[in-house]
Amino acid sequence: MQMGDHQMMGNQRYYRTYVQKVMPAQAGGAVSQNATYVQTAGIRTVHHDGNGQQRIVQLPPGVRQIQQNGVGPAYVRQVPGGQPMQVNFGHPGTIAGRNVAVGVQMRPVQGHNVQQGYQRQQVANQIQQQNRAVFMAQNQQGQQQISYAQAQHRQQQQNQQQHHQQPQHFNHPSQQNQMIMQHRQPQMHHNQQHQMVQPQMTRHQMAQHHAQQPHPQIYVPRDMNLAVPLREPSPEPIPVKIEVPDVPPEGTSAANEEPMPDDGDIDIQIRNVVCNYTLPLHIDLRKLAMNTHNVTYEREKGVMMKQKRSPGCYIKVYSSGKVYIVGCRSEADCKRAARSIARHVQRVMGKTKERVSIRNYRVNNVLATCRLPFGIKIEEVAAKYPSESTYEPELSVGLVWRSVTPKATLRIHTTGSITVTGAQSEADVLEVLSKIYPIVLEFRCLERAKGNVAAQKKRKRKAPVNRGPPIKRERFDDSNYRNSGVINNQVYFSDEDEDLYDELDLEE
């Protein structure tokens, strides 16, 4: 902390502008309880003339002769309270731990020093900077040794003569600075007095005091640019032209797209054929079931069910003579199964000598599937043909197409798979697929085409779980009654003895 104090000597006031930290005396010591300061720099002298004006002169730095254990702001305490003061006059020494000059005695401003009080601050600054250099230069030239005070007095006289000879130009920057300092001097004097009067503040009070002081504003000229780039500007990127292929909108059809390669004829597979007919006789189902193998007879429903291996199908026979055949893979297999079961009924019922004919033979349903070599945009098909098609993605993944002539129902999937149901014959299946092919070809899509990749993949059977050898369990017979079990509604265990409860009196 730097502070300043002053001492009045006659009509002159001494200022110590640069002081060190305040060192309060300790209680119980030889030094009285007062705040003292240590001088470390120059002294400024203020002189009052007859007109009431103040003149300031800056004296060179030096060491003032002080008294030991003095009291008041004019004296300096260099050691803690209770210890003797160090004499620093006339020999090398320190003031508050700093090296000081020796052999110089500061006197009150008298005689010619009073005249120096009327000099401008520019002369005082020159004296402060040059006095010691002149004194050392004269001694080095081998001239007569003079004291430091005499050299200082001679230098002041030379500067005074140069000052009277040179004209005063207040436009000079150095003189403008002097005028600014003279205007600021009363404010500095007020701040110094305020610091002398106030006692030592606590750390919290000092923080508040500094926070209240306004921060100095820095004036930046207009020509000065503080936005200094941290690095050199990078060159501007060169635009690169990227060619984007023309993509047709989603709403357009795929008729203008590149046609997909022809993989050959479309393979249509018949999965199921359902037919029925009637025999002109009453059939005894119990007798027929007793003379037929691989059958199931349900007397309550009045039906006999038979599973035929060649051709593979499933047959239902009613006592009224109606026969239903399900599961054949072609119409030819369905006719062959119908003739076979009719001949077997004729033999069992003893009608071999009579003519039994098949009446009302009809194919009810043909189920067929086929796979197209491209994908289909079924949402666009449903939008273009709302009367023939029905598409409900929340209910089913496929589009339902209802054909009137020939009568059939088709289920079309996005993968290109088509399922035909409700056809009356294989010819109807071929006809309805021939009609639907140009429609789905218009809405094909390449990204959904899978080709024969899915067809080439074989379904892998799940590997059986490796289990240990089967555990053979004993049969419940008379030989293992004693192990455990239930006999005559009584539960017993093999480790129980027959006379276990004989010794207990249960009536008590």
Swiss-Prot record:
One of its GO terms (cellular component) is nucleus. Coiled coil: none annotated. Gene3D superfamilies: TATA-Binding Protein (3.30.310.10). The keyword Transcription regulation applies. It is found in: Nucleus. It holds the Pfam family TBP. Keywords: DNA-binding, Nucleus, Transcription, Transcription regulation. May be a general transcription factor. Plays an essential role for RNA polymerase II/ama-1 transcription in early embryos whereby it activates a subset of RNA polymerase II promoters and facilitates the reestablishment of transcription after mitosis. This is TATA box-binding protein-like 1. It comes from Caenorhabditis elegans.
